[in-house]
Amino acid sequence: MELILATSIGILFASGIWLILRPRSFQVIIGLLLLSYAVNLFLFITGKIQVNRPAFASEAVSFIEGLYADPLPQALVLTAIVIGFATSALYLVVLLGSRGLTGTDHVDGKELEHDE
Amino acid sequence: MSLLLAEIIVLPILLPLFTGALLLLINERHHKLKFFINQTSTLLLFFLAVLLLGITDSAPAEQGLLVVLSANWAAPFGIVLVGDRLATLFLLVGALLANAALIFSYSRWARLGVHFHTLFQFLLMGINGALLTGDLFNLFVFFEVMLAASYGLLLHGYNITRIRAGMQYIVVNLLAAVFFLLGIALVYSATGTLNFADLAAKMPTLADEPRQLLHAGAAMLAVAFLTKSAIWPLGFWLPTTYSAASPPVAAMLVFLTKLGIYILLRLYYLLFGANSGASAGFAADFLLYAGLMTLAFGALGLLASQESSRIASYSAVISSGLLLTLLGLAEPSMLSAMLFYLISSTLAVTAFVLLTELIERIYTPADSVFALSMEFFAPEEEKQESAGVAIPAAMAFLGMSFVACALIIAGLPPLSGFIAKFNILHHLLQLPFSLSHWLLLILLMLAGLTAIIAFMRFGVRSFWTAQATTSPRLKLNEAGPVLLLLVLCISLAFFAEPLHNLLERITADLQHPQRYIEQVLSTLPTRKEAP
């Protein structure tokens, strides 16, 4: 389990970093999305990898170590997903605007051969 | 402290939130009404900030904090909002700049696109929230609120330059957010808490292994804040962004870099202050040298700048570099000098950003500039820029304001920039000799010199050349904010002592994080009687 999670986070990070260094804005946004998936997973496993454990007790029982999963990372990751989603959507709008105004999807807003 | 009083600290967040929401409902056609509501709310925010600074400053040192437990949960479990002297001082500076920028935007810039006023209020909400929060994740949320609003404002008056700059600005900040979250995750897994006070309380007794994890987390977080405060080499976005943004927005962006410095200041002295065990002074050297590099980069950039907006941008970079260097020196005696410089340089750079737009009208007929930025948006409103009263002797006003800005930013006597710089040098020379101090001394002088050269060159070119210049029509509401900011800077020079005393008290607060920790953690949830 640890190995799978660690590898997948690593692969997501690596692909994300590769993509955001590319010159097309579409590649950049895919890279940003991959990075945010990676970081969300990373945030999620800070609560330790636990399977089949509730995040909170439904009634007042005394706290027993190991019976419950850590609820905080789950709450954090939910918020992070929502915020990441919203800001990526915002970037997408700017990307489309840039595509429409400049006629190219290069991140600099112009193709290399048009360099002054 | 009575219960009702502490709850005032929520208002600087709620007021912009509700105003922004209200403004969303009003149609763009009612421009004056929207402006009026926005301005009223921003003015209220200013008075609120004065009041809050008064409250936090007048209380004795052991109980000056305004702590509000949101949802009535005790401190490490719920999210707390904390107002202390440092936060309320920044609140005040931010509200001042917001008022100046908003008044300036009235006659032209606010009408360039839709939802300027709403975004402006949401930006203020994000700034105030980030200043007042006492929780790392909540800080992230407010940062994102602020950044989302700033994306919108940067793109306000949509043209190709702004889109291009906006894309870079957004990508850089989204990446910074990734680092921010990574940092939060690492800090949480090291300590099991995200509350500032609780983190600080756990620092001295942390075991070795989690401590290393925490250091990694803190470094990740620092990447996010240092990107915001434009440290070299993370600050390349700044000049492009600032010169693309419309002047009132650029004025607010100047304050955002200072917000990065504020967070660093707060977290550094809470987590890595003198009594944080093995972590005391963590990475101070890094901050010092990176700050020096930023200073050098800013000075070189300033020398190479031709356009006024670039001069303003690199002045902001220099100011960030100096502040980061002083933070990295980790000398408590420098703190009040640093804060004084921060206030003075923020006001001066903002005034200059607003002023440059007025100066540029000298040689280009105002309408053509306007038409250029109006290319893609609402061309039918082009003719309506007649609001406000024109002031006489425009050239004399522009010239004098320009000289004042130049003097303050370059740090020449007799204005506040000189006092700030003198203060820094005075403290620097009292420290024992070391290479980095001398480097700082030399770079500080060089930065001043390049600032003088850049400003003189620009001034000579704009005011003294024989090209066909027109005396521009200045509106009172455009000249007013510039004048206001400059008068404030000048009065900083005259009333340096009361301000200095306040800054000394802030310094004392920062050096004794114990007060902060105890007050936050000892605040109890209120028990509400059943009705």
Label each residue range with its predicted role.
Chain B
Residues 220-286:
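Short helix-boundary/re-entrant hairpin motifs in multi-pass inner-membrane proteins
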Residues 153, 242, 321-333, 406, ...:
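Interfacial segments of multi-pass membrane proteins
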Residues 1-10, 21-118:
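Transmembrane helix-loop-helix hairpins at membrane boundaries of multipass inner-membrane proteins
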Residues 20-31, 98-110, 151-161, 165, ...:
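C-terminal ends of transmembrane helices
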Residues 29-31, 119-122, 126-210, 302-373:
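Alpha-helical multi-pass transmembrane bundles of energy-transducing inner-membrane proteins
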Residues 4-15, 83-94, 136-149, 213-227, ...:
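Structural signature of hydrophobic alpha-helical transmembrane segments
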Residues 2-3, 70-89, 202-217, 282, ...:
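Short aromatic-rich membrane-water interface segments that cap or initiate transmembrane helices
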Residues 368-400, 448, 452-531:
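Cytoplasmic/organellar membrane-interface segments at the starts of transmembrane helices
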